[in-house]
Amino acid sequence: MKIEFFEETNFSYRRKQDLEKDLNLHWIARNMAGDKVGDIPAILQVLQHPLTTESEIEKRQQVVTAACENSSVTYQLRDRIVSLSENLTRGLHAILDSRGKHLMEQTMIGVHVETIRELVQGLSEISQMGAKNPEIFKETAFNYFYDSFCEAEPAERLEEQLALVQNLDAFKGNGEIVLEGAIGEGFSLENVEVVSVCDKAKRAGSGIFSGKKGRVIASEEVYQSGVQFANRVVLELLEQCSPFLQQWEEILQTLSRQIIFLAGCARMYERGLSVGFYFCMPKACEEEAEKLYELALALQSMEQPIPNTVSLKEQRALIVTGANQGGKSTFLRSLGIAQVLCQEIGRAHV
């Protein structure tokens, strides 16, 4: 299952120095981002997803254009995806941390249930965003992301998953469990029933001891035994959901990196327009222009830095024009600074 906003080439520089040298990211991070930026080598690694073919560059330029022209939706997606990714990672860490420890089964079940529930609810919210904005998610370059998302998690399946996770721990109150369904790869709770533990306890305890008090004690013991059995069954089922959670953790990490990048592009696009910069996203392959910059590639690692004059036969680009001493270079430096900040903390003030 592959879900992403744009393609990324599996490529990395042989030396970190080459990556730093390309656009002087180390200098930007050290001098402009301050203490908030954190581990500079880690940031450089996050920023490193270069494109090497014309089709990849063209595809991503279309996605960047869609992100800039629909910035409010881009920001909503960023907030939802980043939050979902962070919560899922924390939940998986909590699940792993609970294994091998002498914790109550109810506690371990609660950790599993909450992690699964938050993931499914978050995926459902993303699906609803697409349904409410079909003109963006189906008619712009965002469809590359949304089509693959819907293929992996159809709306009908999400409804079933949502109904299941909302009632997954309902047994806590009355001693009853009914779980059934086959829902998604790695998330199958199929034909499983542990029903009416309380009734079984009452029937089993009615003839064990004479007297009212004895029956209550017996019923309670059998009831607790039934609940413990039910907890073990549910915990084993929830453990089977781990592949589902791990798969989405990997997907959401990729989506988070990409949507933060797109949100940074949209933010700088808005900022540029507000101060009077003119943006052009050329389509004619034979065009050439001076002072050619592409918003999507401005902070990416290429074998050679983007020159001042670029032939559009080889790559799409964005033109930034303005009067002499009009702030073009300052804007481009701000773009680099903002991208470093956006990749690390999700926001930037320029």
Residue ranges and their predicted role:
Residues 1-9, 13-14, 23, 258-326, ...:
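Conserved NTPase motor "head" modules and their coupling/switch loops across ABC/AAA+ ATPases, GTPases
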Residues 336:
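Conserved ATP-binding N-box helix of the HATPase_c
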